[in-house]
């Protein structure tokens, strides 16, 4: 933050740390989303079909790091075929509004040929902020252009999980040890600086 204090903003593999969350991710109220698009999606935990999750904390006064990302698509660092064939689901822990870092999205951008980082000013698709209350769900395709607005009055907490297309017969995905997955995620601390167009993207 502006005082130079490092703040934890993500809880990776949160479903492994919270029995309550692990139970919630198996709840039928979430499970029905698997077929909301007619694609019979499955969870992202390798080999199980269950949904995994990570917790996000949006503190006040954060200056760098993974908390408040500018406009981007989740495949901006690659792996489009893996990240963008399903849905990202946000479970609102605190709710979000104009003052507490609501998620910004550009509806329809998942079907448009646009840059994976920054919002092109010539794009004729309007952006909106998803105002939510505690317990609300947000659902978007990861290929949708979206951003995390910095909270200015109250911090925000949210849990993100996801659903993806099941593997087809003959598909093989290299198994990556959990320790390596954790190390890879830990190295993404400067991803904000690598997203093009970070400056000047604070307004809709």
Residue ranges and their predicted role:
Residues 64-131, 169-177:
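Catalytic core of non-heme Fe(II) oxygenases with the double-stranded beta-helix
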Residues 17-23, 125-128, 148-149:
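Active-site rim elements
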Residues 1-71:
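Non-heme Fe(II)-dependent double-stranded beta-helix
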Residues 53-55, 92, 108, 142-144:
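Short, well-ordered beta-to-alpha junction loops that form the rim of enzyme active sites
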Residues 59, 93-95, 163-165:
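Non-catalytic surface loops within mature trypsin-like serine protease
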Residues 137-139, 144-204:
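Non-heme Fe(II)/2-oxoglutarate
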């Amino acid at each position: 933050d502006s005082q130079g204090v490092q703040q934890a903003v993500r809880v990776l593999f949160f479903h492994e740390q919270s029995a309550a969350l692990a139970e919630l991710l198996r709840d039928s109220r979430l499970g029905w989303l698997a077929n909301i698009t007619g694609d019979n999606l499955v969870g992202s935990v390798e080999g199980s079909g269950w949904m995994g999750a990570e917790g996000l904390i949006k503190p006040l006064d954060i200056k760098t790091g993974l908390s408040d990302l500018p406009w981007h698509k989740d495949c901006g660092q690659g792996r489009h075929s893996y990240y963008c064939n399903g849905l990202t689901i946000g479970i609102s822990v605190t709710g979000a509004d104009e003052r507490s870092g609501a998620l910004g999205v550009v509806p329809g951008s998942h079907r448009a040929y646009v840059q994976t980082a920054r919002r092109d000013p010539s794009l004729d698709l309007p952006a909106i902020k998803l105002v939510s209350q505690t317990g609300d769900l947000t659902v978007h395709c990861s290929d949708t252009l979206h951003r995390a607005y910095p909270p200015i009055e109250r911090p925000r907490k949210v849990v993100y999980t996801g659903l993806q297309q099941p593997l087809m017969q003959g598909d093989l995905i290299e198994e990556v040890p959990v320790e390596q997955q954790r190390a890879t995620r830990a190295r993404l601390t400067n991803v904000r600086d690598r997203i093009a167009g970070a400056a000047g993207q604070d307004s809709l």
